[in-house]
From Swiss-Prot:
NCBIfam families: rpmD_bact. GO terms for biological process: translation. Keywords: Ribonucleoprotein, Ribosomal protein. This is Large ribosomal subunit protein uL30. InterPro entries: Ribo_uL30_ferredoxin-like_sf, Ribosomal_uL30_bac-type, Ribosomal_uL30_CS, Ribosomal_uL30_ferredoxin-like. Part of the 50S ribosomal subunit. It comes from the Bacteria. Gene3D superfamilies: Ribosomal protein L30, ferredoxin-like fold domain (3.30.1390.20).
Amino acid sequence: MAQIKITLTKSPIGRKPEQRKTVVALGLGKLNSSVVKEDNAAIRGMVNAISHLVTVEEA
């Protein structure tokens, strides 16, 4: 299955608690940290919820 690389580019400070929890659930910590996840509907939904904080590219 395809994979995507998710990079945290903006800080979740001052964002809604749901968005901050989504950042943590994806495994992102500090700015510019990246994770590689499977490209499925659940991950895409999480990324869509915080699309203004992250960049996504094919891994």
